[in-house]
Swiss-Prot record:
Name of the protein this chain belongs to: Mitogen-activated protein kinase HOG1
Gene encoding the protein: HOG1
Description of its domains: The TXY motif contains the threonine and tyrosine residues whose phosphorylation activates the MAP kinases.
PTM note: Dually phosphorylated on Thr-126 and Tyr-128, which activates the enzyme.
Lineage, highest ranks first: Eukaryota, Fungi, Dikarya, Ascomycota, Pezizomycotina
One Pfam family linked to the record: Pkinase
GO cellular component, one term: cytoplasm
Top-level taxon of the source organism: Eukaryota
EC category: transferase
Record function comment: Proline-directed serine/threonine-protein kinase involved in a signal transduction pathway that is activated by changes in the osmolarity of the extracellular environment. Controls osmotic regulation of transcription of target genes.
Length: 207
């Protein structure tokens, strides 16, 4: 088994909510491509331990150790999308999908993990989610109305990284990240830009 330690999860309201959210989701999500929770216990110091299945490594370690052959890329992508389909059908948005949150075992079985930032689908979402390289533009542009498409964007970034062996959008900060995306994909159309609520962000995009 694997044990995930969460130190002092009750020390702040944010940590407490995040821990409760992850525990609640892991308790109910049951799928071949989603990590399963086998047990949980609290230490005398009030640290929480999640006991899960052990897979051995993660996709980030694989990508930094060697190039992936085509058949492995296909199989990994299939399992990622299969897991996401299940998670999304349960009304959940992961919001922090990245190679280090995708576990792999010696048989190339893959499981999505770390649901600490996941949320039940809601018309209003917070923008502070997801590691920068895999963050969808609508999150960077401070949109609060987004849905499962942010996970699909992250999956696309991971797919490109598996093909190229390096991150597709390795931004140094939010501004540089958005610039790299628009250089490759172009500027969003006006009807999309005009939905941006923040005036500062709107001026930046139009510039």
């Amino acid at each position: 088994v694997a044990v995930k330690k969460i130190m002092k999860p009750f020390s702040t309201p944010v940590l407490a909510k995040r821990t409760y959210r992850e525990l609640k989701l892991l308790k109910h999500l049951k799928h071949e491509n989603v990590i399963s929770l086998s047990d949980i216990f609290i230490s005398p110091l009030e640290d929480i331990y999640f006991v899960t299945e052990l897979l051995g490594t993660d996709l980030h370690r694989l990508l930094t150790s060697r190039p992936l052959e085509k058949q492995f890329i296909q199989y990994f992508l299939y399992q990622i999308m299969r897991g996401l389909k299940y998670v999304h059908s349960a009304g959940v948005v992961h919001r922090d999908l990245k190679p280090s949150n995708i576990l792999v075992n010696e048989n190339c079985d893959l499981k999505i993990c770390d649901f600490g930032l996941a949320r039940i689908q809601d018309p209003q979402m917070t923008g502070y989610v997801s590691t920068r390289y895999y963050r969808a533009p609508e999150i960077m542009l401070t949109w609060q109305k987004y849905d499962v498409e942010v996970d699909i964007w992250s999956a696309g970034c991971i797919f490109a990284e598996m093909l190229e062996g390096k991150p597709l959008f390795p931004g140094k900060d939010h501004v540089n990240q958005f610039s790299i995306i628009t250089e490759l994909l172009g500027t969003p159309p006006d009807d999309v830009i005009n939905t941006i609520a923040s005036e500062n962000t709107l001026r930046f995009v139009k510039s």
